[in-house]
Amino acid sequence: VTVVRDTGERAILPPFTDEHTQLRETINRWVREEIVPHVDEWEAAREFPRELYNRAAELGFLGLKYPEELGGQGGDYVHDAVWAEELAAAGASGGVGSGLGAHTGIATPPVYRFGTPDQHERFLRPAIQGERIAALGITEPGAGSDVASIRTMGRKVDGGYVVNGSKTFITNGVRADFLVCAVKTTEGGGHQGISFLILEREMPGYEVVSKLEKMGWHSSDTAELSFTDVEVPEENLLGEENRGFYLIMENFAWERLLMALGAVGAMRRLLAVAIEYAGEREAFGRPIGRFQAIRHKIAEIGVKAEVGRSLTYHALRRWLAGEDVIADVTKAKLYTQRACVEVADECVQILGGYGYMREYGVERALRDARLGPIGGGTDEIMKEILGRQLGL
């Protein structure tokens, strides 16, 4: 499948350069040559090989936005935006994209932004090199969108903290070598009492309770974790004590932008699949793309993909400029996730019986897309944020 690129694409782009365009092509080629041929196998195995992190690191993809002195490529967040969109556009699958994306997009950025030089050396550098896998631990069995309700406790002791509690729905949780984990460090402190600690897999009391079975994202590992008297040294405190909630909120903006970019990439790919199939599949003596009903479906897919891209790139431009982007990011996340589900569903319909089979990958795209309106903040939470932004 050749991903659709229209002649008006550059007119609405954020500050992309020829270097970013070249990066798109490099990522797209890597995914098509080294990932797509194995996706079905990895989906069945319920994980992709750990060596994929090493290969991505070798190509520089795990450190695109990090400085060269830490082993990164010295790029910027636009490079990371290209990475998120093109993984999906080239067909990496939601599982592969989420596993690599959780490592580069949500788990390591807090370590870079708020970590000490020592933490950079112990955690960020080996993560960039693909030697240590990172995960972010916020969600708990009783606390999802309501972050302030987390109950995992980090009790202050001499020289550090003792952590007790649990986390769930943790992407990379089964294989993560370290977990950037939100804990309560002040009893009854609400959002004011949250801190971030870096928990390491080998710490006694750190347990992977189960590898969770999911509707989609089959090739990524998702875990429930348990912590029983886990002793965490003080040097693993990330940022200031009791200021973790603000770190979470800052990280959420970028996570939601990455989710929007991934959905934009997925819709680009689905549009290409639909166009290709409609041009080749014949019914009643002519390609089905000649029928108005099919043409209109594909036209709507194109509109949704373009609207999603415009909203997302607008939010990205403002985010890069350091502006207040809460409303823009929320709109982009809300629209693209729901639109991607609708686009994938229409693609299944256009392909008919073949859409229901695994050969074309659109049934997987539908299963993968369905997490979008839930993860990173549900649609309902996004609407609540927008309502408040409107003064309601």
Question: How should each PLM-predicted stretch be described?
Answer:
Residues V96-D118, G144:
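N-terminal glycine-rich flavin-associated loop
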Residues L100, A127, G142-S145, F169-N172, ...:
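Short Gly/Pro-enriched turn/cap motifs at secondary-structure boundaries
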Residues G130-I138:
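A short, Trp-centered hydrophobic/proline-enriched beta-strand micro-motif
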Residues G160, N164-V208:
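A short core secondary-structure module
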Residues D229-L247:
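Long, acidic (Asp/Glu-rich), low-complexity accessory segments flanking structured domains
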